[in-house]
């Protein structure tokens, strides 16, 4: 791969994490972990590819994200992490705000927002090799952000095998998480 796009993510993927030394997941976390990993490995547009984890602060969402990130990156896969706020993005390895990652306009219009990512850009190239998108604080994101990111991924990923312009988020597995009790 050429250019400087995604160097940060690729460097992170190259680091070996001591996955086995991490504490175990509980039963509910393990079920979600298994479903998400199966979706990433399966690559089938017919397999479920959109997931949501809900729980209050301290319930283990961030721990589950970290476990998934370390496991998939240890397999050489690219995992992108976004959150609505910069604070939440900083809590996860390589996390960025959804506005920054997908170049969404600020302020975000209520309808018709688009990601400012061209088909030949480095960001588009990074999205094409991404295996999983983790989106924290999802309940706090406006609908326009979901629509813009989904359209962007549908456009960028449409020519890839096992991806589909008709699928939400272009068929890329996406794990949403958050706490509906914290909606502004």
Where are these predicted regions, by residue range?
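Conserved ATP-binding/catalytic motifs of P-loop helicase motor domains
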Residues: 1-184
